[in-house]
């Protein structure tokens, strides 16, 4: 994962999975990336702590680039993913 804090590219789509728990955030991400094209950036907002483990594995498995993983607040997690 690159350390690009403050230099993230424009976001092409946002997926808000607030309030959802495993496996729903990953299932919704999988569906969302199908509607996007390679090179686009997806911002994911989550509240499930399991996403800190699941999102990086999702990216690694599918070849997407996890540009940034951040804890926006105690209960909010942000992910910026460039699609492969």
Regions found by a protein language model. Give the residues of each.
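Amphipathic, hydrophobic secondary-structure cores in small proteins
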Residues: 17-71
């Amino acid at each position: 994962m690159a350390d690009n804090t403050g230099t993230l590219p424009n976001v092409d789509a946002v997926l808000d999975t607030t309030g959802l728990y495993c496996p729903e955030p990953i299932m919704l991400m999988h569906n969302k990336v199908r509607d996007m094209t390679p090179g686009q950036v997806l911002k994911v907002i989550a509240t499930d702590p399991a996403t800190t483990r699941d999102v990086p594995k999702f990216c690694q498995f599918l070849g997407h680039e996890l540009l940034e993983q951040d804890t926006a607040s105690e209960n909010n997690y942000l992910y910026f993913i460039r699609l492969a």
